[in-house]
Amino acid sequence: MNTIINVGRQFGSGGGYVAQAVGKKLGIPVYDNELLCKAAEESGYSKSIFEGGEQRKSLFSMSSFFSSGRLGFGETGYVNDDMLFKIQSEVIRNIAEKGDAIIVGRCADYILRDLDCLDVFVCAPMEYRIQRLVQNEGLDPDEAEALMRRKDRTREAYYNFYTFGAWGKADNYDLCIDSSILGIDGTADCIIDFGRRAGKIR
């Protein structure tokens, strides 16, 4: 049985960094941007067609990205986000079947709901997230707050649309953890300890 950890996160909480820290400590590959590359490669499209997959729900042109005519899309050059979600879901399932993996976002907890995964949601207080964005991205506090709220809204809309669930709601996860309490490394250690105690990290 493979160890699969799905990590959802509030924007600015450092959830992506936490996932990377968990992966480094356990020697497990982390799929975030790498997932986009793999999805694009396996479906015959440029990586850029998957960028922002969690950030939108719309119909858009594929003509500048179309490369192989695979998946039966023909020469129309158009495909909607529902098709892209299906492709992405297949890629995520393939990753989970092939070996241990940590998957960041992308509704992976829902896509892999029939497997014995560890589903984690990383959150943090607004003030902490704003501070991180100011320090790491060079934004002023107002810009950081506006960006944070916008990203969280779009992630929530994307997740709720495809899963019929509630993004960030505790019942959807095995563990919800505030990264501001222990920091990135301490949060990663806590997730690993919890996962081992729960029998989900093997």
Q: Where are the regions a protein language model picked out?
A:
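Small-molecule kinase domains that catalyze NTP-dependent phosphoryl transfer to phosphate-bearing small molecules
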Residues: 60-65, 140-185
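Short beta-strand-centered segment that lines the nucleotide-binding/catalytic pocket of NTP-utilizing
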Residues: 29-41
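ATP-dependent small-molecule kinase phosphotransfer cores
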Residues: 40-100
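Long, contiguous binding/interaction regions
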Residues: 106, 110, 126-127, 139-140, ...
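Glycine-rich phosphate-binding P-loop
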Residues: 6-23
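Extreme N-terminal starter segment of soluble prokaryotic enzymes
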Residues: 2-4
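Conserved phosphate-donor/acceptor-positioning beta-strand/loop module used by diverse small-molecule
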Residues: 114-151
